[in-house]
């Protein structure tokens, strides 16, 4: 990825180091009162940012990736619950249709990119190819290699067009992932979150770690 886009991206190597450390140990939890206090402050910041986006015509694209149960959906819900759906839009695409499979891989994501005055949040993104699809065998290694080669150019084109691109990887430790999956199984209010894919991916922890690290290296801007 060109250095010009660097100011709009998280540093890949730093993210890789952080997530690799999380493989072994889960960070300490915040106390509920501290979390609620901080969230109120951040909600106010988000509302202020929303007004800035509307006033300036900014285009913001946020991509959330991470392991299953890492908290992507919950994080996105927390971000969007106090802002306007006219400005903030969440994109969570289903499995590709047969027609989409025949198209250029990145094509299905392009119509969802933000216009002026919009914030678009992807709950999983084009990085599916480097993560889920690779680990679960839904694409070939040749397709993964091509994607990792082309994605910096795609993202550079986004940035050049005026889109502010932010990418986040959410990590979870093996023990915490086990606890969260068991919670979904045992709680009828959460069972809808559990899929066959969750259970299959659970057994492929190190495959996901390797895919994650390869993804960081290929999309690093430093």
Task: Tell me what each language-model feature is.
Residues 1-222:
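Glycine-rich phosphate-binding loop of ATP-dependent small-molecule kinases
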């Amino acid at each position: 990825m060109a250095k010009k886009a660097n100011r709009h991206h998280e540093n890949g190597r730093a993210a890789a180091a952080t997530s690799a450390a999380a493989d072994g140990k889960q960070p300490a939890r915040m106390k509920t009162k501290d979390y609620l206090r901080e969230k109120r402050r951040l909600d106010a910041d988000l509302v202020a940012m929303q007004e800035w986006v509307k006033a300036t015509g900014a285009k913001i694209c946020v991509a959330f990736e991470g392991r299953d149960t890492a908290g992507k959906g919950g994080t996105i819900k927390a971000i969007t619950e106090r802002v306007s759906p006219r400005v903030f839009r969440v994109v969570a695409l289903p499995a590709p249709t047969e027609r989409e499979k025949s198209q250029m891989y990145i094509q299905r994501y392009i119509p969802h990119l933000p216009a002026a005055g919009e914030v678009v949040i992807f709950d999983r993104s084009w990085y599916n190819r480097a993560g889920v699809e690779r680990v679960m065998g839904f694409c070939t290694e040749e397709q993964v290699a091509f994607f990792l080669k082309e994605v910096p150019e795609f993202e550079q084109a986004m940035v050049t067009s005026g889109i502010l691109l932010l990418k986040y990887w959410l990590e979870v430790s093996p023990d915490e992932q086990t606890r969260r999956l068991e919670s979904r199984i045992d709680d009828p209010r959460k069972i809808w979150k559990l899929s066959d894919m969750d259970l299959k991916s659970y057994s492929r922890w190190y495959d996901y770690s390797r895919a994650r690290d390869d993804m960081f290296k290929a999309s690093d801007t430093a």
